[in-house]
């Protein structure tokens, strides 16, 4: 027979896992002049309170009750312990979770509902903390369409009836403080949808760590890492990045190097090896393909399921902190690819999180990306915007990342992106612009720039959307820089042409100067160009092996000497022949081959020239740093221009044919002696050593609207760089 102090309906809802607030039943409650202790123990045979007062099972249920006098109640600790024995004889003692007050404050919930709680990662998820001098973990999750949410894990046998959570008013946020849980415990949320009764088991969207694939559990994580990069962060805040060299080495951590058995290296091991190499090569920054947790290696990290979790493939979150800290201690910045455009449909993660379209847009015409088979975030929902912006700030503030490269921005800006007529919904004005995504990006960039001094935001945006890298107060999107996809596509298309046909494609080299200063551009040669049967960079080149290598050296020079910051994907610097694969390390043995070693040494010298030549970086984003000498010699496929700074000028001359050009006359800005500071045909780089004996003297002959000129030897498929001797 049911105890009269607890209704059958309440117990039924507990048993079915549909009660929205188990605190109304469980814990210690006044009943007239007495008190009742109530606990819910689905696997217990017997139980007691504090080891001295037996609990009695309510017949036919998992509810145990003890009736206490006022005196006994006073002797009972506020947060009492429950002892119980299971059928197999195992004994357990825990502090009841149902004696604690709500831990989430009204301000937290208010800011979150408004989409302005930028440190919500310190509130939601799993927070290791002490409450009333009792240590445990505070769990909180947003699931407004749930009739019940429970914390499940090894600690309770993954039984969703053991630790049901309480709701917080109309916020949709559920919470529960569980005493005794510690960093390292594995957990998930079990969610019952209130309309369909569908039962879901989900990873924590705010989890700071996750299990190694194929396992998908969230891990309670409390960092103990001690940062040592204060000087770096202080200097970064005042860094004049627009007038400084930024040379980015794009890296996929799982395939840069592996151990002898083909397994992943740890973040700490990678840090030691990668930083040494990057410093030797002369790069200023590393850009990591996404390392937020993802289940599928083949996605390269671009289908994220754990937005706040550095992937466990390479170690713990503190191991990743070590990686970033080690880079900073060695003067290397760290950028990260970040994916707020879409997320995968894996059932254990964000997709249909509470049984409804919670993080994604409900209408598939806005909520599904047809090409990628993924969901698109609902940027019009406050809590979703908050999740993403807080995530960006988490990587920048808590993990000390120096900047984010935002993936697939074009797919966010346009409602009809990669959609046929009838497959998309216009905005409220009838247009194709995604107004909610635009406002999200502006808010994101404004908050990053305000809260993270010196952090950079970079857009992979493949259309001609205006003012991507202009401040929000000017009407721009607020990014620091934008990838110049047009330059990359035109350049690679040109280089793939047989030199016989290059005169007919000459405009592909010159056209980018028509828009080069409309944005703050990065010139990328990225991972996307060396996969999916596109071939490795050197394999794209026409001709025999010698010509392919010469073209590769020419491409490296062309990228370095053009205005714009630089990015090169790993393996390109030593002309790896194979397409990149995430399943193996790079072909480092090629660095022992003379031709590949030559390309590597050229890239190293180009990087050194770039870092030590203000003309190559001071005016990347304005026309003062660039002048054509001759952009019209399409018949011979020769280009020449000047890179300019207040301190120096560099003359850059390119020969895009395998025919050496002797006595080739170019105009020069000043009379004097010019030294040949770089020649990509040098035998040091695997070339034929055709050149100009180290220096040239001008003649008083006007040429190309210049006051003087000189004749030089242009090596085949090569670039020559000249600097006037002081």
Swiss-Prot record:
<dbReference type="GO" id="GO:0005829">
    <property type="term" value="C:cytosol"/>
</dbReference>
<dbReference type="Pfam" id="PF02922">
    <property type="entry name" value="CBM_48"/>
</dbReference>
<dbReference type="InterPro" id="IPR006047">
    <property type="entry name" value="Glyco_hydro_13_cat_dom"/>
</dbReference>
<dbReference type="InterPro" id="IPR037439">
    <property type="entry name" value="Branching_enzy"/>
</dbReference>
<keyword id="KW-0119">Carbohydrate metabolism</keyword>
<dbReference type="Pfam" id="PF22019">
    <property type="entry name" value="GlgB_N"/>
</dbReference>
<dbReference type="InterPro" id="IPR014756">
    <property type="entry name" value="Ig_E-set"/>
</dbReference>
<dbReference type="InterPro" id="IPR017853">
    <property type="entry name" value="Glycoside_hydrolase_SF"/>
</dbReference>
<keyword id="KW-0320">Glycogen biosynthesis</keyword>
<dbReference type="InterPro" id="IPR006048">
    <property type="entry name" value="A-amylase/branching_C"/>
</dbReference>
<comment type="subunit">
    <text>Monomer.</text>
</comment>
<keyword id="KW-0328">Glycosyltransferase</keyword>
<keyword id="KW-0808">Transferase</keyword>
<dbReference type="InterPro" id="IPR006407">
    <property type="entry name" value="GlgB"/>
</dbReference>
<comment type="similarity">
    <text>Belongs to the glycosyl hydrolase 13 family. GlgB subfamily.</text>
</comment>
<dbReference type="GO" id="GO:0005978">
    <property type="term" value="P:glycogen biosynthetic process"/>
</dbReference>
<feature type="active site" description="Proton donor">
    <location>
        <position position="460"/>
    </location>
</feature>
<dbReference type="InterPro" id="IPR054169">
    <property type="entry name" value="GlgB_N"/>
</dbReference>
<keyword id="KW-0321">Glycogen metabolism</keyword>
<dbReference type="GO" id="GO:0003844">
    <property type="term" value="F:1,4-alpha-glucan branching enzyme activity"/>
</dbReference>
<feature type="active site" description="Nucleophile">
    <location>
        <position position="407"/>
    </location>
</feature>
<dbReference type="InterPro" id="IPR004193">
    <property type="entry name" value="Glyco_hydro_13_N"/>
</dbReference>
<dbReference type="InterPro" id="IPR013783">
    <property type="entry name" value="Ig-like_fold"/>
</dbReference>
<protein>
    <recommendedName>
        <fullName>1,4-alpha-glucan branching enzyme GlgB</fullName>
        <ecNumber>2.4.1.18</ecNumber>
    </recommendedName>
</protein>
<dbReference type="InterPro" id="IPR044143">
    <property type="entry name" value="GlgB_N_E_set_prok"/>
</dbReference>
<dbReference type="GO" id="GO:0043169">
    <property type="term" value="F:cation binding"/>
</dbReference>
<comment type="pathway">
    <text>Glycan biosynthesis; glycogen biosynthesis.</text>
</comment>
<dbReference type="InterPro" id="IPR013780">
    <property type="entry name" value="Glyco_hydro_b"/>
</dbReference>
<dbReference type="Pfam" id="PF00128">
    <property type="entry name" value="Alpha-amylase"/>
</dbReference>
<dbReference type="Pfam" id="PF02806">
    <property type="entry name" value="Alpha-amylase_C"/>
</dbReference>
<comment type="function">
    <text>Catalyzes the formation of the alpha-1,6-glucosidic linkages in glycogen by scission of a 1,4-alpha-linked oligosaccharide from growing alpha-1,4-glucan chains and the subsequent attachment of the oligosaccharide to the alpha-1,6 position.</text>
</comment>
<dbReference type="GO" id="GO:0004553">
    <property type="term" value="F:hydrolase activity, hydrolyzing O-glycosyl compounds"/>
</dbReference>
């Amino acid at each position: 027979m049911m105890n009269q102090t607890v209704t059958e309906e309440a117990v039924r809802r507990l048993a079915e896992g549909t009660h929205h607030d188990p605190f109304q039943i469980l814990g210690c409650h006044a009943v007239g002049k007495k008190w009742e202790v109530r606990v819910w123990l689905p696997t217990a045979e017997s139980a007691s309170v504090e080891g001295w007062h037996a609990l009695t099972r309510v017949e036919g249920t998992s509810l145990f009750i003890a009736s206490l006098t006022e005196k006994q109640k006073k002797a009972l600790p506020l947060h009492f312990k429950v002892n119980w024995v299971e059928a197999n004889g195992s004994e357990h003692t825990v502090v009841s979770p149902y004696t604690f007050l709500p831990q989430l404050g009204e301000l937290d919930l208010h800011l979150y509902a408004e989409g302005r709680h930028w440190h919500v990662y310190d509130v939601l998820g799993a927070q290791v903390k002490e409450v009333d001098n009792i240590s445990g973990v505070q769990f909180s999750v947003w699931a407004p369409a749930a009739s019940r949410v429970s914390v499940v894990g090894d600690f309770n046998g993954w039984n969703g009836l053991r630790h049901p959570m309480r709701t917080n008013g109309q916020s949709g946020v559920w919470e529960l403080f569980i005493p005794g849980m510690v960093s390292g415990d594995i957990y998930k949320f079990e969610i019952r949808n209130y309309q369909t009764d569908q039962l879901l088991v989900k990873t924590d969207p705010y989890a700071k760590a996750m299990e190694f694939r194929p396992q998908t559990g969230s891990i309670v994580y409390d960092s103990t890492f001690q940062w040592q990069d204060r000087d770096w962060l202080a200097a970064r805040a005042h860094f004049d990045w627009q007038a400084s060299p930024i040379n980015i080495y794009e890296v996929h951590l799982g395939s840069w190097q592996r151990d002898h058995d083909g397994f992943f290296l740890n973040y700490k091991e990678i840090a030691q090896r990668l930083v040494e190499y990057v410093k030797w090569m002369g790069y200023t920054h590393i850009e990591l393909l996404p390392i937020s947790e993802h289940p599928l290696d083949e996605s390269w990290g671009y289908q994220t399921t754990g937005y706040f979790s550095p992937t466990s493939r390479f170690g713990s979150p503190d191991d990743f902190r070590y990686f970033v800290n080690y880079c900073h201690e060695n003067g290397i910045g760290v950028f990260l690819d970040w994916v707020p455009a879409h997320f995968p449909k894996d059932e254990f993660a964000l997709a249909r999180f509470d049984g409804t379209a919670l993080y994604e847009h409900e209408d598939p015409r806005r909520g599904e990306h047809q090409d990628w088979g993924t969901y698109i975030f609902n940027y019009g929902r406050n809590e979703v915007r908050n999740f993403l912006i807080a995530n960006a700030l988490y990587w920048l503030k808590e993990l000390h990342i120096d900047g984010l490269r935002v993936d697939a921005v074009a797919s966010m800006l346009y409602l009809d992106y990669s959609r046929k007529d009838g497959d998309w919904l216009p905005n409220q004005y009838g247009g194709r612009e995604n107004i909610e995504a635009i406002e999200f990006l502006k808010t994101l960039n404004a908050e990053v720039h305000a809260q993270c001094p010196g952090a950079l935001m970079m857009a992979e945006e493949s259309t001609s959307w205006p003012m991507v890298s202009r401040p929000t107060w000017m009407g721009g999107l607020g990014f620091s820089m934008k990838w110049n996809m047009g330059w990359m596509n035109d350049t690679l298309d040109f280089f793939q042409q047989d030199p016989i046909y290059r005169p007919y494609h000459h405009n592909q080299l010159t056209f980018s100067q028509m828009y080069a200063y409309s944005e703050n551009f990065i010139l990328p040669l990225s991972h996307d160009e060396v996969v999916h049967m596109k071939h490795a960079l050197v394999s794209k080149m026409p001709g025999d092996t010698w010509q392919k290598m010469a073209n590769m050296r020419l491409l490296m020079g062309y990228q370095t000497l053009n205005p714009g910051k630089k990015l090169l994907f790993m393996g390109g610097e030593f002309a790896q022949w194979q397409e990149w694969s995430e399943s193996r390390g790079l072909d480092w043995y090629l660095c022992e081959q003379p031709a590949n070693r030559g390309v590597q040494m050229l890239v190293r010298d180009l990087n050194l020239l770039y870092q030590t030549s203000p003309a190559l970086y001071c005016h990347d984003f304005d026309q003062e740093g660039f002048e054509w000498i001759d952009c019209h010699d399409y018949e011979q496929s020769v280009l020449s221009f000047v890179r300019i700074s207040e301190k120096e000028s560099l003359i850059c001359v390119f020969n895009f044919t395998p025919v050496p050009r002797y006595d080739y006359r170019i105009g020069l800005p000043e009379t004097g002696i010019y030294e040949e500071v770089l020649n990509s045909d040098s035998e040091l780089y695997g070339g034929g050593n055709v050149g100009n004996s180290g220096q040239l003297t001008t003649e008083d002959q006007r040429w190309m609207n210049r006051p003087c000129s000189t004749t030089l030897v242009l090596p085949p498929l090569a670039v020559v760089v000249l600097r006037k001797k002081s």
